[in-house]
Amino acid sequence: LSPTGGVVGLKGNLAPEGGIVKIAGLKKLQFTGRARCFDNEESAMKAVQSRKYKDGDVIIIRYEGPVGGPGMREMLSTTGAIYGQGKGEKVALITDGRFSGATRGFCVGHVGPEAALGGPIALLRNGDLIDIDAKKGTINVRLTRAQLASRKRKWKAKKSDFGSGTLWKYAQTVGPASLGAPTHPGKK
C-alpha cells in the first residue's frame, strides 16, 4: 500500500493550479526529459503511431482542457499506443486533458491553468527540459520566471474550431479543471 494512494497531486511552474499523476504501477516516481509539443491529441497520436518520438521525451498534449477541447477529452488512445509500443516507462506524457483509471505509464493530466487560457503548458517549446517528481509532488520546466513571462507576452490564444453552438457556449462558461470544470456563475 502506498501512503498517498494511487494518484498524486503535482504543482510547480508548469502547473501552478496543479496536475494529477497516477503512480499505481509505476516503477520510477521521477522523470526528467525534453518536451515534444503537440497542440491536440490527433497530432500526438499520429507522431506516436509513426514512432516520431524517442526515449526520454516528455510528450505534451495541450489545448485539450475544459476550454481548449472543449470538454477535456480523455487521452487513453495515445497513452495506450505508447504503452503498446513498449515505451510506457521510457517516456512521459503531460496534458491539460484527462485520463481514466486504465491509463498506464508516466502520465500527468488535468494540468492547470490549461493551454487555452495561456497556462505555462501553452508556453512550452520542443526541447524544454521538464522535471516531474511524484515523491515531492512537483512538476517544473527549467525556465526562469523571466523566460516564462517573456514567452507569455508573445503568446497568442489559439483560435477555437468552434465559433458557435453548444461546444462554443460550453467553452465560454466552463471553469478550470482544478475546480471540477464547473459551468455555473461561481466558476472562477
Over which residues does each language-model region extend?
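Feature captures the catalytic cores and cofactor-binding loops of soluble hydro-lyases/lyases
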Residues: L1-K188
